[in-house]
């Protein structure tokens, strides 16, 4: 485990985090600007020093107040910043090999292949696109043979086409490398595609931490997501494809099924499916003759009025999964919706695209 129990005064912000993170998969650190995300990873990487506390990575003690403070180069932690920070006078090959602990051709070839940078090795940073620079920066960090990788919003400085270019490489790294990654982001799109676990910071304090789906659907997460962007993550597996239409059928653990747009590639892995709360409607009886392809049976768990009183955020239990729906107070009163009541949730199949679906690692 990555054990963190630290405090740091940062101007008016006091960062205080006490938690354990798994040494496998991708842990996303999420929060608004100024929440302390970058400050936390700087403390983990040794770029800044806590005022008190302790940090350990597995059996290695990285920091203990007044007794141990390993410098960054001794922590065996790779760091990828928002900007690539490549050496302009080195070629891509020179940047990659700078700082390599062991000159092993096998590791070099594997990293270069995973990142798709074989054809860039002789070029210089000034000739690379933003996405290419970040791929080289990631490769350089990996070739130091780290025990953990810190990534501080590596897509933040890129435009949308470059983000789309780089994201598949990050997905491949997350799936192929047996290396824990702490990934800072304020983008839920990135977190959906990459993360297995999630830690939420607010004003320097941790307000939620755990498996991605659990935190994403939690009440703690709800206040930090704009009302119109509230969504749920459901777990499902591919069952089959429709023989006549470009749609794929997914099966949930509770027996409900989901039809989603597109012919998804076969996989035995569990999928994470994002559903926007504004795309969910509810009814108390099974509808007949509807164009809506998805009808999920569940029970009302909780109802939360929005701050302005214009909407109700309805949480629906679907076995172990949970689904958010935005409804009006009128609908709540007319349908007599209360906790424990059995209902049907309707979701149009066309609202879930491949950008809303990701494999669990």
From Swiss-Prot:
Native organism: Shewanella sp. (strain MR-7)
A GO cellular-component term linked to this record: plasma membrane
Family per similarity comment: Belongs to the ABC transporter superfamily. Molybdate importer (TC 3.A.1.8) family.
Keywords (A to Z) from UniProt: ATP-binding, Cell inner membrane, Cell membrane, Membrane, Molybdenum, Nucleotide-binding, Translocase, Transport
Primary location group: membrane
Domain ABC transporter: start-end pairs: 1-228
Protein's gene: modC
Gene Ontology molecular function, alphabetical: ABC-type molybdate transporter activity; ATP binding; ATP hydrolysis activity
Subcellular compartments: Cell inner membrane
Top-tier EC class: translocase
Mop domain residues: 289-356
Full protein name: Molybdenum import ATP-binding protein ModC
Record-listed E.C. numbers: 7.3.2.5
Membrane topology: Peripheral membrane protein
């Amino acid at each position: 485990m990555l054990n963190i129990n630290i405090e740091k005064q940062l101007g008016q912000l006091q960062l205080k985090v006490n938690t354990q993170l798994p040494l496998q998969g991708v842990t996303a650190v999420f929060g608004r600007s100024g929440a302390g995300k970058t400050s936390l990873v700087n403390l983990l990487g040794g770029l800044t020093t806590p005022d008190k506390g302790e940090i350990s990575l597995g059996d290695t003690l990285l920091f203990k107040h007044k007794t141990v403070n390993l410098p960054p180069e001794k922590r065996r932690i790779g760091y990828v910043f928002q900007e690539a920070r490549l050496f302009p006078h080195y070629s891509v090959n020179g940047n990659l090999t700078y700082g390599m602990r062991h000159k092993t051709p096998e590791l070099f070839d594997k990293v270069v292949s995973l990142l798709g940078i074989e054809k860039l090795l002789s070029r210089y940073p000034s000739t690379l696109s933003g996405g290419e620079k970040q791929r080289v920066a990631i490769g350089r960090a990996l070739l130091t043979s780290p025990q953990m990788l810190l990534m501080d919003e590596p897509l933040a400085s890129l435009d949308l086409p470059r983000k789309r270019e780089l994201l598949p490489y990050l997905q491949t790294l997350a799936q192929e490398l047996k290396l824990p990654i702490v990934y800072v982001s304020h983008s839920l799109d990135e977190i959906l595609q990459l993360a297995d676990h999630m830690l939420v910071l607010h004003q320097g304090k941790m307000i939620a931490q755990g498996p991605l789906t659990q935190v994403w659907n939690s009440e703690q997460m709800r206040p930090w997501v704009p009302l119109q962007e509230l969504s749920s993550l459901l777990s499902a597996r591919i069952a089959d494809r429709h023989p006549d239409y470009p749609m794929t059928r997914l099966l949930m653990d509770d027996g409900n099924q989901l039809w989603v747009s597109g012919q998804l590639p076969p996989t035995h892995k569990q999928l994470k499916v994002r559903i926007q709360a504004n795309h969910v409607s509810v009814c108390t009886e099974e509808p007949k003759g509807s164009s809506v392809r998805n009808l999920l049976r569940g029970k009302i768990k909780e109802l939360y009025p929005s701050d302005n009183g214009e909407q109700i955020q309805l949480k629906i239990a679907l076995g172990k999964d949970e689904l958010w729906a935005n409804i009006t107070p009128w609908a709540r009163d007319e349908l007599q919706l209360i906790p424990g009541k059995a209902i049907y949730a309707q979701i149009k199949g066309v609202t879930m695209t491949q950008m809303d679906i990701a494999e669990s690692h």
